[in-house]
Amino acid sequence: MIKKIVTTCFGLVLGLCVFGVGLVAIAILVTYPKLPSLDSLQHYQPKMPLTIYSADGEVIGIYGEQRREFTKIGDFPEVLRNAVIAAEDKRFYQHWGVDVWGVARAVVGNIVAGGVQSGASTITQQVAKNFYLSSEKTFTRKFNEALLAYKIEQSLSKDKILELYFNQIYLGQRAYGFASAAQIYFNKDVRELTLAEVAMLAGLPKAPSAYNPIVNPERAKLRQKYILNNMLEEKMITLQQRDQALNEELHYERFVQKIDQSALYVAEMVRQELYEKYGEDAYTQGFKVYTTVRTDHQKVATEALRKALRNFDRGSSYRGAESYIDLSKGEDVEETVSQYLSGLYTVDKMVPAIVLDVTKRKNVVIQLPSGKRVTLDGRSLGFAARAVNNEKMGESRIRRGSVIRVRNNGGRWVVVQEPLLQATLVSLDAKTGAVRALVGGYDFHSKTFNRAAQAMRQPGSTFKPFIYSAALSKGMTASTMVNDAPISLPGKGANGSVWTPKNSDGRYSGYITLRQALTASKNMVSIRILMSIGVGYAHEYIQRFGFKPSELPASLSMALGTGETTPLKIAEAYSVFANGGYRVSSHVIDKIYGSDGRLRAQMQPLVAGQNAPQAIDPRNAYIMYKIMQDVVRVGTARGAAALGRSDIAGKTGTTNDNKDAWFVGFNPDVVTAVYIGFDKPKSMGRAGYGGTIAVPVWVDYMRFALKGGQGKGMKVPEGVVSSNGEYYMKERMVTDPGLVVDNSGIAAQPSRRIREDKEAGAEDVERGAADEVRQEVQETPVLPSNTGSKQPQLDSLF
């Protein structure tokens, strides 16, 4: 009877086993063909951030969540490979993807625990999970993981599997892979790690947060000891090495990628351009983008701009605290303050601080980002003293929890504030359009709006040279005389009213030459010129400089620069004057490399005199250059003469009520535009003229950008003649070329010549030309308005 029972039980067990094996076999047959392809492993491309560099190789921007540096398995030190194997998978080189003995141990443990509590995942299984599967603890997921691990083992070598694991695994602190972790935790190359450091990092895969040595040093130390003992047991290290490693004091020096703060606006422009092309992939493909800007130029430009804004704001009253945090709750105040300050940036040496207390004497106790506490007395508070506990200032008063800015002024901390006024500077290579410097505002962190490329502003009188260029093309000369007198135009004002424009200074000079008019920035002359050549003609002609029709008002107000455009577009347009009449396009990207180091794309810019289209007659460009040299020499931009250079030219601009101030200056090599104004347009007051506030910024930057001696000035194009210090297109030269434009704006009879006190260099004069040429003034044919519309190409990528 007993024998029969035993036999029956044995048969049942055997049957169940066979049945179970059959079920497993069926599951394998059904599941295995559905396993994902291993292409992503065989052609592994880790997610690597977009890194942007200046032309001189400084990092100016990094975009992407994952910090990873791909490293081949042979470049990882053997001691690290041994440590990871000892910690995660001792039988890595013996099993076929699944460690059967490890599984058996885990099964027993789970049965005892009454559920799935632990696993026996091999390194291969972890690769399968990290690339293809979720982290949920279910038998189905573990079964698929085991099958996928087997498939991986059949397709890839052990070293390749290890390489994938070492580069893909997350190790905390935004570090993916051991090479990245070595930098982030120890600020070392992975090949420089000691045994103690290796064992500490090898403990992270199991639980990056729990075994983070910075956050949980005690648990991390226990994990390190466990790994070192395993290495000793596997005879990977000696007893002496283990003991030395255990006794070694580790120094955590978190790697912080240094990002040059002077070119953040440029980096953002590049990021946007790549995102438009690649979407989210732009942040994961490991692109390394080299730009055209140099950090030394950026730093000088930034400081020049900030100095002007600081000076303008110096007389302003204190506007109040930057923000406020509630410190009344029962939280750890020191930790709350430190955490809040860690998210703020020091800008222009203005350090963020939080008010901890206001004493009875109204001294203010603050905490700095360093953790240091400072007491500000009345002298340190300065202009901010009236804001201390001043209920009339509401939320902006200085009180406990207020966020303010301070600066170390010779050992004394004083309260300061960021200027409200904003500014931008953009500098281009006149021949290629390459951006050499671009600062989009006072501070990128507080306001990311890029005023150089995004701010649509009225250019004011900086637009006048384009009107004058159109006039030269239409038949006028630099000595053509125009009546600078008041004018009233019925029906040309708002709602059909009378338009009565005025010169900005309220002064009128009667008949003066075009040269004199542009030098003094006479509004009445610009309007009469436009009336003479026709709004339609000018509207089409000026598009050759790169302006869109929508940026050009089809009315006489165009003569005063009432359209809207960006500082970058203005600089690009002025490059036509600087480079001899060629249309080039601004660009900030030079080269793009892939994560493998191969060149993926290189900018092929339009170059003046080579492949760039001719936008205007080179003689026209030259004459405009010579006229605008007088603007610098004796006109509204004479402050730029402080550089002591004879090759510079330019034009100032100021809009109604001094809301916008401009200066665009150049020589044949560099064009630099400066714009200053409030983001919400309002008057800057009496100091808000282009020649007063914008020119000094330009001078400070260009003194550095043009260092290295005097330039030669623009080469005289063929067909330009000089007489009595004035320059003409050869066919326009007459013995008495002074042409008058009367009140109506219609060309009238020739008049006497006004001779100007200007000396021409010997290289500028074509002797005898005035005696040989006498003919009627004629119009230069207008090129199609889309001339120069061809854009520079970024080969293979864009």
Curated annotation (Swiss-Prot):
Single GO molecular function: penicillin binding
Segments passing through the bilayer: 10-30
Pathway(s): Cell wall biogenesis; peptidoglycan biosynthesis
Region described as Transpeptidase: 414-700
Keywords assigned: Antibiotic resistance, Carboxypeptidase, Cell inner membrane, Cell membrane, Cell shape, Cell wall biogenesis/degradation, Glycosyltransferase, Hydrolase, Membrane, Multifunctional enzyme, Peptidoglycan synthesis, Protease, Signal-anchor, Transferase, Transmembrane, Transmembrane helix
Main location: membrane
Gene Ontology terms: cellular component: outer membrane-bounded periplasmic space; plasma membrane
GO annotation terms (biological process): cell wall organization; peptidoglycan biosynthetic process; proteolysis; regulation of cell shape; response to antibiotic
Region of interest called Disordered, as start-end residue ranges on this chain: 751-798
Catalytic residues (UniProt): 88 (proton donor), 461 (acyl-ester intermediate)
Protease recorded as keyword: yes
Intervals, Periplasmic compartment: 31-798
Localization terms from the record: Cell inner membrane
Regions of compositional bias (Basic and acidic residues) in chain numbering: 753-777
Region entry Transglycosylase, spans: 50-218
Topological domain spans for side Cytoplasmic: 1-9
Superkingdom, taxonomy of origin: Bacteria
Matches recorded under SUPFAM superfamilies: beta-lactamase/transpeptidase-like (SSF56601), Lysozyme-like (SSF53955)
Membrane-topology descriptor: Single-pass type II membrane protein
Protein family per UniProt: In the N-terminal section; belongs to the glycosyltransferase 51 family.
Record's function text: Cell wall formation. Synthesis of cross-linked peptidoglycan from the lipid intermediates. The enzyme has a penicillin-insensitive transglycosylase N-terminal domain (formation of linear glycan strands) and a penicillin-sensitive transpeptidase C-terminal domain (cross-linking of the peptide subunits).
Protein's UniProt name: Penicillin-binding protein 1A
